[in-house]
Amino acid sequence: MKYPIGIQTFDKIINGGYSYVDKTALVYKMAHYAQNLFLSRPRRFGKSLLVSTLQAYFEGRKDLFKGLAIEKLEQEWEVYPVIHIDMSRGKYYQLKNLHAILNGILSNYEDLYHVGTLSENSDVYSERLANIIAAACQQTGKQVVVLIDEYDAPMHDSMNDEKLQNQIRNVLRDFFSPLKQQDANLRFVFITGISKFSQLSIFSELNNLKILTMKNEYATVCGFTEEEILKKYTEDIEAFAEENEMTYDEAVAALRYHYDGYHFSEKSPGIYNPFSIINALDDKELNSYWFSSGTPTFLVELLQKKGLDMLQIDDLWASDKRFDVPTEKITDPIPVLYQSGYLTIKEYDKQSRLYRLGFPNEEVRQGFSTSLFRYYSPDGMGKYDALCRAYYDCVVRDGDMDAFLSHLKTFYDKFPYTLVNNNERHYQAVMYTIFAMLGADITPEQPTSDGRIDMVLKTDDYIYIFELKYGKDAVTAINQIEKKKYFSAFADDKRKKFLVGINFSDDSRTIDDWSVIGG
């Protein structure tokens, strides 16, 4: 199987014999749904390939769609002039970079349709784009299709410079203004991006812009469902399973755990990150692919400023008015986390109209916790290797939580004083972050018939039941586990169980006492 890793052009995938998961039925539906559409999805989720597929369709390239769903849906295969505006082709840390990109795009289409430039390197972008659209319509006798990929790339690059961002916004608003003026000459306008900016103020004059982002019927237009993966990549999963000494079902479960879990609407099925899953099948390894670039520092700092931690953002109830909102003035990290793909919809409650948000999968959870660990740890990732080795040797292999807690205490002892809060939940959040970073199967606040267990950690052979205390002692923690019979929730599980009581000193602000019972 040839995997289209890094390939975002539809004709190159088809002509090159690369694997393609058929999304063309949805492409056809989009093309006939409305004139002006907007879709946001996280990075590396197939937005550019979707744009390229739409371009091939509107250019009437029937040969590329042989054997695909759209071949039976489309009868006419009309050819339309297509203007493809790709804003991801550059970096926008200076205003001149934006001017260079826009001039380049316009010059190419002015040459194609023999439109004279108003003046050399003219920055009267609205008039130039309007002239191109009018000329394309006049010369072909067909309405024009405009495809705008990653419209918000300049806004993201300028996020830390308010003056530059305002300048960029004004330039883009002018550049795209002909999309309203030339409405009669337009057959279809499609805009993609990662996030919203002031309710798409850049396109504020565009008539009847339909937003597909949270519509159930388009939830699967980017990314792969498990059904699609099992149908397309059966042999690849078998090869992955053999390489990793798993059964087929175990391999599917492992891939699901690491890369599935995105939901983009109320009724969305689970969606796999396409970039991660094809890389994993190609490498036959469970690595971190999408998250390799890490979490922006400003986002981690904002989480700290707002008092949000891993426990809160991994199980957060919010209305869509909180997370599906503009992000250029970041006062709440939740919209950025959701729109960037760090959080996804886990559940929807119709009565309250609230969504439960959380990490979509293990790749994101582990990657995000690693970013927070860098913030917590005075040595950056210097302590990670030692903790990781201790975790797998002590906790996973030997069932020796006592030995691991000795290593963990050393880490806590070196915490910067300014990062330590005087409450039990803070230490619980940090401990959860550490275990998540280590790839542990860790569940915080697990409900029982008589309360909530602070944390439950499971390995193939062991179950660890944690109770954390602050300013008390480990015996008090163990007594609570026994009194409330937290262990009874796992009575039918044949794995060895351990009760783990940990106390954090209100004086030294580190682990000062622990007790491990069971085995």
Regions found by a protein language model. Name each.
Residues 1-423:
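Phosphate-binding site recognition
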Residues 145, 462-464, 498:
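Structural motif
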Residues 410-443:
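Acidic-basic catalytic patches of nuclease active cores, encompassing PD-(D/E)XK
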Residues 489, 493-519:
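Domain-level recognition of nuclease-like catalytic cores that cleave nucleotide substrates
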